[in-house]
Structure formats: C-alpha cells, structure tokens
Swiss-Prot record:
Listed name of the protein: 4-hydroxy-3-methylbut-2-enyl diphosphate reductase
Cofactor(s) this protein cannot do without: [4Fe-4S] cluster
Residues at which (2E)-4-hydroxy-3-methylbut-2-enyl diphosphate binds: 41, 74, 124, 167, 225-227, 269
Pathway: Isoprenoid biosynthesis; dimethylallyl diphosphate biosynthesis; dimethylallyl diphosphate from (2E)-4-hydroxy-3-methylbutenyl diphosphate: step 1/1; Isoprenoid biosynthesis; isopentenyl diphosphate biosynthesis via DXP pathway; isopentenyl diphosphate from 1-deoxy-D-xylulose 5-phosphate: step 6/6
Residue positions binding isopentenyl diphosphate: 41, 74, 124, 225-227, 269
Organism, scientific name: Baumannia cicadellinicola subsp. Homalodisca coagulata
Gene Ontology biological process terms, A to Z: dimethylallyl diphosphate biosynthetic process; isopentenyl diphosphate biosynthetic process, methylerythritol 4-phosphate pathway; terpenoid biosynthetic process
Enzyme Commission code(s) on record: 1.17.7.4
Amino acid sequence: MRILLANPRGFCAGVERAINIVEKVIAIYGPPIYVRHELVHNSYVVNTLRNQGVVFIEQIHEVPDGAVIIFSAHGVSKAIRKEVQSRNLTIFDATCPLVTKVHMEVARASHKGIETILIGHYGHPEVEGTIGQYNNTDGGIYLVESLEDVWQLKVKNKNNLCFITQTTFSVDKSSAIIDALRQRFPFIKGPHKQDICYATTNRQEAVRNLTMATDIVLVVGSKNSSNSNRLVELAQQTGKPAYLIDCASDIKENWLQGINIIGVTAGASAPNILVLQVILKLQSFGAESAEELRGYEEKMIFDLPRNLHVVNK
C-alpha cells in the first residue's frame, strides 16, 4: 500500500496565530489562563494547552476577577466582548483575522440597516459570534444552511439585502446557496472578496486532487471541526470511502482491505504530529513510506495582537 499526503493540509495561519498567542500569554503571565470556548476545534491541541494551565470556559462569570482571558479563534459576539470589558480582566483576542473581516462586514451592514443573510452552520461558535455583531432592530440577520432555508426565508425588504459566509463553509455548497440567493433576491449584494478563507478553499481543492489518486481518504481532525467535516464530505461525494479520525488509534485495519493507495489529509486545526502518527500506524499495517502530492504553498502569516506586542517588550 502507498500513502499519499494532500498538500496543503493541517494548521492554517489563523490557528497558528491563536496557539502562539496563548503560549506567549502563558509565558508572560503564568497559569491559569482562561480561554472562552475551545481555542480551536481539535482535542489534541485543547488537551495540550489544558496541560499547560489553560482553563476553557463558556460563561464569563466562570473567570475570576483579575484573571487573563483570551477569545478563541472563532470570535465572540459584541455582547460577550462588552461583558468581558466590564470586568477587571486582562483581555487578549485570538480571533482569526479572516473572521474579524466578516465581523466588520456585518457591523457595517448593521449600522446601515441592511438586512444580512449569513451562510453557515447552526450552532457553530463562529456563526454565533458573527450573528452577534448585528444589533440594528430596523434590519435583521438571518442564518441559512441549505437551499431549503433560502426558499423558506422571509425578509423585511428584498431590495436591501447582503450576504456573508462562515469562513469554514463548503466552497461548493456556498456557491449553490449564493446562486439560489441571487435567484430569489436579484438585488442582493455580496462581499467584495469571498468570506470562505484561503485555507478552507485550499484544503478542499487538495482533497479533490487527493481523491483522484487514491482508493480511500483519511481526514485527521476532531468531530467538532467544521472544516475537517467538510473535507470528509467532499471526499465522500466522489464515491470514495472517507473517514474522520481524531488520532491514529481511530484507524480500523479492515478499512484497508483491498486498498492500494491511502490518501491522508488534515483539517486546519489538526497539528502535523497527528499526521505523522497516522503514517506510522498505516506503516504498521504494511503501508510504504508517504509521498506528498504537488500543491499550493501557503505563505500567509498573521501578526499578533497589538497589546500582546506591548506586553512582550
């Protein structure tokens, strides 16, 4: 059996930035450090940070006065931000800059009273934070996840609409939903640049290429990782068997019966060490050394928050 690795795969710039922020804050302030929600959706990363003294919370009242709190990469609503700012807390923001871009689009639409349609997944923390940027009661913000949602949607003024997209949404699915929105609301406006982030787009394209060259696809990522789940769905849509695995021990040897070429990729929140462990596990089942497919070289780097630069001097 051969192993082919998707390229690119694994950590994106937003995840690397978020982890870097937390590690620097721990080095400066010492534990415990509080993070609102899981920093990124990967159990290995979360458990590693927890062992370093990070306490993950959902409610702000769980954080004691005088403590340090960090917002996760998914971002938070205006209400959460206001609640934190009203407390005696030291605040650092690990929100992905590409999520912040979407937040700013929503805030501008809210200020102008433009009704906003968010293409995203119900219950995802990024979606909750994005919806929480809109506070104009004369307008409104609406969440759609499917074509059915589009056809059933009711708005106040069909001539004063815009749409935005969750950064980790499926590229193909969002394209179909946007087409439906434009069909139903001809005057709807979209962002100047697409909201789905570069890493999501690149990893989905890499999986398309991977499925063409392999018999099975293993996606390294946690069950609550939106972008990892999209990679599995995309691979399965090609008719190839595809599995989401949190770690190497999740692999079942019977998956590999009759398989000649195994494809491996990783979601944007999955560290490379997990991919290396998967390769070793596959080799224990008789696979050869891994080869990497040609792909797009990502050079994106996001700067740290300004207030962390000041403290770090």
